[in-house]
Amino acid sequence: MAKVTANDLLEKFQFELLAGEEGIYRPITTSDISRPGIEMAGFFTYYPARRLQLIGRTELSFLKSLSDQEKEERMTKLCTYDTPGIILSRGLEAPEQLIAAADKRGVPVLRSTLTTTQLSSRVTNFLESELAPVTAVHGVLVDIYGIGVLITGGSGVGKSETALDLVRRGHRLVADDSVEIRQQNEDTLVGYPPPLLQHLLEIRGLGIINVMTLFGAGAVRPFKRISLCMNLELWDQTKAYDRLGLEEDKMKIFDTEITKMTVPVRPGRNLAVIIEVAAMNFRLKRLGFNAAQEFSERLTQVIEHGENEF
């Protein structure tokens, strides 16, 4: 899991640092954000100290109604050595008791001009993306008609050459050779290129080429949600390959399953066209049109009625 700190939030969202500078590199370990409303009332029994604390106009309005002693007590309990940071929304002024407690415990206090709802949404999305579990898969990721297609297979089977052909046909390259995959939600896998390999494609006999330089900015993407896996393998005459498309294999990455198709490779087969059509057919299936199922139903009707013509 990647490491995220309050300093990353400062750089990403241009927050203002009000206090607790010595704690800006304290790790944030969860994407959950807490609004300490009940804690302002003095109830800290279930206080989630390891979360970012988001304070808005409601919390500060209640805090102003307390005595100075109560303010100091609540802010001292709010700022623990485990708290990764406190964020104030709407450009609100930080109470002096909060500043003092934060400096004492090294809790970064940040301020933003965004509303509380906007701030919560943006920070949560950022943390979910950065803290998502990550794995690397050997393959190529291409955006084909809006479908993120992960092309896998053994070394030398033709993954990069197929990707190059797809780029020439107007599709967009995301990553070649190594694809970093993050599970951002239970059913969402997003692929990224390693920074070192971004926009690069390796073609045996040709070397490394820069796809963006050769084909333009429209030929690449920085990331893409993965929906389909196309596995390339050398043609095995002893193996029975699916010819109807009724069966659907799955590939599991983390807790998410995606559709997987196996494409046998041998001379004369245009893999780019096959994968392109597979992506279009996958989109049709998601819209409710299944050619294989329709053919199967027609065949069943013919058999049942004893007809001899299709």
Curated annotation (Swiss-Prot):
The catalytic site is made up of H138, K159, D177, R243
| Positions that bind ATP | G153, G154, S155, G156, V157, G158, K159, S160
Coiled-coil boundaries: none
SUPFAM superfamilies per the UniProt record, alphabetical: HprK N-terminal domain-like, PEP carboxykinase-like
Provide the GO MF annotations for this entry: ATP binding; magnesium ion binding; phosphorelay sensor kinase activity; protein serine/threonine kinase activity; protein serine/threonine/tyrosine kinase activity
Presence of keyword DNA-binding: no
BP GO annotations: regulation of carbohydrate metabolic process
Please give the cofactor(s) recorded in the UniProt entry for this protein.
Answer: Mg(2+)
Q: Where is this region: Important for the catalytic mechanism of dephosphorylation?
A: 264-269
Subunit comment = Homohexamer.
What family classification does the UniProt entry report for this protein? Belongs to the HPrK/P family.
Q: What else is known?
A: Both phosphorylation and phosphorolysis are carried out by the same active site and suggest a common mechanism for both reactions.
> This chain belongs to which protein, by name?
HPr kinase/phosphorylase
Q: Where does this protein come from, organism-wise?
A: Shouchella clausii (strain KSM-K16)
Q: Which gene encodes it?
A: hprK
